[in-house]
Amino acid sequence: MGFRFNDRVCVIDINDVKYSVTFQKALVDRLNEARETFGSFKADGDKENVSEVCAVFDRAIDSILGVGSAAAIFAGRFENIMERYAVLRYIYDELTAFMKSISEEKNVQPETENPHN
């Protein structure tokens, strides 16, 4: 079997809307930031007001799915920290599983390991 490039697009489905996320180094960085958001939520969640915490989650969601995605996802809904946490966690878990499947493929060059990018 020869070398081949794999599909680097993960499709995230939220409320029947599909968001295409391209696997690249910047995505890994944004996922690490999302993980930090989870940690800060656990540490400071009860100290912040709901709007501030929701805004943090919205920025994290937008950084991964694209600007305005969080507003579209939560349009017409009351601010709810747990809903935002659940959506961001779902996105994080889906992308982590996607990256794991890419890394397990044989004869595939993941972009994060390509020294020419």
Stretches with model-predicted labels:
Residues 70-117:
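C-terminal charged interaction modules
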Residues 47-58:
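Compositionally biased, non-globular sequence tracts
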Residues 4-6, 24, 39-42, 58, ...:
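Compositionally biased, low-structure terminal segments
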Residues 1-48:
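Short N-terminal mixed-charge amphipathic segments
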